[in-house]
Amino acid sequence: MSIQDNFRLAMRRYIYSVSIMSNRDLNDNLNAITVSSVTSISMNPPSILICINKSAKIHDSIVIGSKFCINLLNKDQQQLSDLCSDEDRHDQRFLDKNWNTNDIPFLSNAQANIFCKVDKLASYYTHTVVIGLVEDANFSETISTLTYVDGKYI
């Protein structure tokens, strides 16, 4: 097997929380994508890192100064995760009644919402590393986070 195959199989052993990154682009279009590569960077200033594939529809809407939300999903939101990872169903992503789309789109029933402003972008081969400054955050008191390992939700 190639190093890429071995690396992919090794990474499948990690358990990831599942989130949806959502934003509104400069033309007022709503975007959302399922992401598992979300990491806190610092508490001072509060900041977060997300990796987005350059081929994703949302990619070009992520620019310095733009705003986005990381919606940490709960165990009941597996179907929404699947929907937001399917480029062919992009037009269906905001049909869920729990989306608040007044400003930065966010899921009102998510485990947590982390509202950010893009501070830095770093291109790295197939992906862009997005560094966001956290402007606000809220969370549910009950912890029931949707997780993913070895190609399956748990």
Roles of regions detected by a PLM:
Residues 1-154:
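Basic, polyanion-binding surface patches
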